[in-house]
Swiss-Prot record:
This is CASP-like protein 2A1. Residues 52-72, 123-152 are extracellular. The lineage of its organism: Eukaryota, Viridiplantae, Streptophyta, Embryophyta, Tracheophyta. Residues 1-30, 94-101, 174-201 are cytoplasmic. NCBIfam families: A_tha_TIGR01569. Keywords: Cell membrane, Membrane, Transmembrane, Transmembrane helix. The chain crosses the membrane at residues 31-51, 73-93, 102-122, 153-173. It comes from Populus trichocarpa (Western balsam poplar). Belongs to the Casparian strip membrane proteins (CASP) family.
Length: 201
């Protein structure tokens, strides 16, 4: 009588496939968690650099709080840091993904990507005006007198744009996870030629 190889049994194959899927999910979860923690650290760095950005000399005193764009940059970096930490904790939890959760990550990642991009863009414009000046709006070249202030502002803005890149990557990831896992089934009404896409959790 020919002996059956236990390793090739359907049950063993199923268990092996399940273990492999769990390993892949754990690896993916760890990678996404780290990807969400990186912008948190960057946001805190940009925030701290800008908060400490004050210079006083013979020409007077200048602080980040004197410029609305830089205040906005600080607030947005704080919000993004908090969201990054919260989302990293949620992703790190070993629980099955659901449709509402996938949609929440997708929408929040998209919104914060544009918010942090706007903060970086507006701050860049203000820093450019401080460096080059603009005679039409009587804006002098402040960086000539406050070089240290402008240098710290530049560092904070550069870090912020690195955060933008991280959030763009997160947006792509959350988009892929949502639309690859949850297809939109189409309901067709006979005789009317009407198709409606529906989602199920």
């Amino acid at each position: 009588m020919e002996k059956r190889d236990k390793g090739s049994s359907p049950m063993a194959t199923m268990m092996g496939s399940r273990d492999e899927n769990e390993d892949v999910e754990n690896t993916t979860r760890t990678a996404e968690t780290m990807l969400r923690l990186v912008p948190m650290a960057l946001c805190v760095s940009a925030l701290v650099v800008m908060l400490k950005n004050t210079q006083t000399n013979d020409y007077g005193s200048l602080s980040y709080s004197d410029l609305g764009a830089f205040r906005y940059l600080v607030h947005v970096n704080g919000i993004c840091a908090g969201y990054s930490l919260l989302s990293a904790v949620i992703v790190a939890m070993p629980r099955a993904s659901t449709m509402p959760r996938a949609w929440a990550f997708f929408l929040l990642d998209q919104v914060l990507t544009y918010v942090i991009l706007a903060a970086g863009t507006v701050s860049t414009e203000v820093l450019y005006l401080a460096s080059k000046g603009d005679t039409t709006i009587t804006w002098s070249e402040a960086c000539v007198s406050f070089g240290g202030f402008c240098h710290k502002a530049l560092i904070s803005i550069v870090i912020t744009f690195v955060v933008v890149i991280c959030y763009a990557a997160l947006s792509l990831l959350s988009s892929y996870k949502l639309f690859s896992k949850y297809d939109s089934p189409v309901l067709t009404y006979p005789g009317k030629g009407i198709e409606i896409a529906t989602f199920h959790g």
